[in-house]
């Protein structure tokens, strides 16, 4: 195949049918139940296969369902993009924490000064904002570095976990700390519900209660142990999420942060860690009056990941810089690209598909179609803005301006989240209707395209075990169809989302950059 711009198909398109998975169980399967003559015909006429979108295939823990952010990041990167949860877990498994100077420097400084180490975070196995395994791994790191006094300030979950499930985590943490340092030298020194410690709506009165119990050892409640404090909270009618700030005082005196102490915030998700972090590190902080603000060891409070670019605190696991994503590669080759979606998925075909880049690349155009504003939930309008999007997309194809087009149809996912089976069927049918027009335009232009999804959703609308509506994503594979006029074209099986960027470049007769470790899935018989 000659590598010339004149001979390649134009445009090459990636059509992402969000939330459109393949489930062999046909019951409460909106994808199966919908009338989809276009998809049915495409599968008959063109090469097709299934793709993995979950767990290790997209940089998540095994078995973890994919999501739109992760899916589009992998689609655009052309390599598995390890998510923060997985990156940190892998660093622990590979014994790499000890070689991370952002973690070791403040601990070493505190040890040298004879000061304490404080660990802050959501003590939970939920895996959404944090994981207790990460917290206990850093405690073990502190022990290896010679720390004598380590205090854990535990935020309680009850939201990504059962409402009253914190006891097991507290008992496990105290047992491990006692094993590492001795029970008198290390323990859970405060507990507070995430409602207070992890606010994200500038409710500073809540954050202040968490800050004061961590820094000053002053809470509205006092207990001799974390477990006793939790029992008292339950007796007050509080669940884990709402546990009042409780100072734990096994020896009668509170734990207070002091100058020279080390402090590490061990949540990995940013949005609910920002406010408390700002209270620790910002000189001009105005959320509430800080009665105490100790000068912490080394460069101050450590963030496990970057909670915000403007927070002046060291980051143990900074954002990965994705070089030569599909969008960047196409731009470097002097080609034109279109990203198009309705509001609900606009960030996914732009920011996430570009590897976390806000700005357009050279030669990139973005088309935003507003999602419906006249309904509370999209099951009231399952077609959403698919027809308006299709009008714009077909016009763009007919204009012949673009070499690469990336489009997302949001319906299967957004209506799937409603749990409304009948509406999800209508959503899938609307997408199929639109898909027919788009494929006709691509064929008319002499182009090629891949039709796929970022993850499943609408193919399982009722949970098979509980019988309740299922509103979450699934771990089912998703279809991949290669629409091409080439005779004898094939698609390899057992692919993942990261394989599509190198595949698209190959369709465009463009070389694949070495950073893209995904496989090219197209071939010939």
From Swiss-Prot:
Pfam family, one: iPGM_N
GO molecular function: manganese ion binding; phosphoglycerate mutase activity
Gene3D superfamilies cross-referenced by the UniProt entry: Alkaline Phosphatase, subunit A, BPG-independent phosphoglycerate mutase, domain B
GO terms of biological process kind: glucose catabolic process; glycolytic process
Domain of life: Bacteria
Names of the cofactor(s): Mn(2+)
Function: Catalyzes the interconversion of 2-phosphoglycerate and 3-phosphoglycerate.
Annotated protein name in UniProt: 2,3-bisphosphoglycerate-independent phosphoglycerate mutase
Source species: Chromohalobacter salexigens (strain ATCC BAA-138 / DSM 3043 / CIP 106854 / NCIMB 13768 / 1H11)
Phylogenetic classification of the source organism: Bacteria, Pseudomonadati, Pseudomonadota, Gammaproteobacteria, Oceanospirillales
